[in-house]
């Protein structure tokens, strides 16, 4: 199924945007509908269908979902302008949220519910967007070949120990960009550039694939270490496929910087679209994402960490939840994103 295709799931009361076309003019002259919202999302997780179904069950409001890649979503919404039917925009990375904000896709929103439940570090200072789940960017390693203390810090994978033994995805991946932005903030650009150059020198192959591909490459012996988000590993571990479970069993996860600033943590989040025709319903949806029910779905169905503090997680997620996380405000990832890409380019990380 194309990422630009609509997804119609009648059983879940999730309806598609009409013809997936901006021809559905829901701009300032269109009548709002209290019974639906139009969701533009860069989250591509089947588990999210449970979120939409739960929201519809609780409120009677239908969710019309259109999935796109982050840059496509931004460009499409900009092109639609005031006629955009989008009510809510979701992204899977703080840097992408910041780019959407810079493009004028959000309007400020602060409600008592959101302000009380979403930590300050996980949201835009101006209320343009809010984080609803967290994910840590960790080091996956071959448990048979690598000792945990050899991957206790991000800079270790750039050292001579891992020459020809590192697998990574491309530098323009949003998760890698946000990690680099955080490293620049902590280390300064010069040290971050040296780190990127070291990783490039240590690559076992050209950057390719997604996070699960990196984990599988470690398990297959193509490399000994890789960068991944936690929920991809947990997805493999929870898979009904025996090969996936075996791969997860042979790969360990290191949460770097436990003796320092803590492991890099990113968010998935969203905000109220700038020209939302169904504003009241959209606000209900955003507040629902911060509810105990939605937070439990994000943790249980997609193995993400809740954004709301103090909530329990399923056993598999909880087992990897006891770590020190970097308290950095995630808005910094967007502010330094262009600089991060420039560092990767200088290092030759394609």
Give, region by region, the residue ranges found by the protein language model.
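C-terminal motif of bacterial Sec signal peptides marking the signal peptidase cleavage site
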Residues: 16-19
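Early extracytoplasmic/lumenal segment of secretory-pathway proteins
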Residues: 21-98, 350
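Short beta-strand->loop
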Residues: 40-43, 125-126, 141-143, 149, ...
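Periplasmic-binding protein-like
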Residues: 164-172, 288-311
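An extracytoplasmic/periplasmic, membrane-proximal ligand-sensing/linker region
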Residues: 190-192, 303-350
């Amino acid at each position: 199924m194309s990422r630009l295709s609509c997804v119609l799931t009648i059983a879940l009361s999730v309806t598609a945007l009409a013809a997936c076309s901006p021809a559905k003019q829901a701009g300032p002259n269109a009548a709002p509908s209290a019974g639906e919202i139009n969701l533009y999302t860069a989250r591509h997780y089947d588990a999210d269908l449970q979120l939409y179904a739960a929201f519809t069950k609780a409120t009677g409001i239908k969710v019309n979902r259109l999935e796109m890649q982050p840059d496509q979503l931004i460009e499409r919404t900009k092109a639609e302008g005031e006629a955009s039917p989008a009510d809510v925009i979701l992204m899977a990375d703080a840097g992408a949220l910041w780019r959407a904000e810079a493009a004028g896709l959000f309007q400020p929103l602060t409600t008592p519910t959101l302000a009380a439940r979403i930590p300050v570090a996980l949201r835009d200072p101006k209320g343009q967007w809010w984080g609803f789940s967290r994910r840590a960017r960790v080091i996956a390693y071959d448990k048979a070949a690598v000792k945990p203390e050899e991957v206790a810090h991000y800079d270790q994978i750039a050292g001579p120990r891992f020459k020809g033994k590192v697998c990574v995805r491309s530098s323009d991946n949003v998760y890698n960009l946000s990690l680099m932005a955080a490293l620049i903030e902590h280390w300064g650009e010069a040290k971050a550039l040296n780190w990127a150059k070291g990783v490039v020198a240590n690559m076992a192959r050209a950057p390719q694939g997604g996070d699960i591909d990196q984990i599988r490459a470690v398990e297959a012996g193509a490399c000994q270490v890789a960068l991944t988000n936690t929920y991809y590993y947990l997805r493999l571990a929870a898979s009904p496929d025996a090969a996936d479970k075996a791969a997860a069993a042979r790969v360990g996860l290191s949460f770097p910087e436990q003796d320092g600033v803590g492991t890099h943590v990113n968010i998935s989040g969203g905000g109220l679209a700038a020209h939302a025709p169904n504003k009241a319903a959209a606000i209900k949806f955003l507040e629902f994402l911060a509810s105990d029910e939605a937070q439990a779905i994000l943790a249980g169905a997609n193995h993400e960490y809740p954004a709301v503090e103090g909530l329990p997680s399923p056993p598999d997620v909880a087992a990897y939840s006891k770590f020190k996380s970097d308290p950095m405000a995630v808005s910094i990832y967007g502010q330094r994103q262009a600089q991060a890409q420039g560092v990767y380019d200088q290092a030759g990380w394609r």
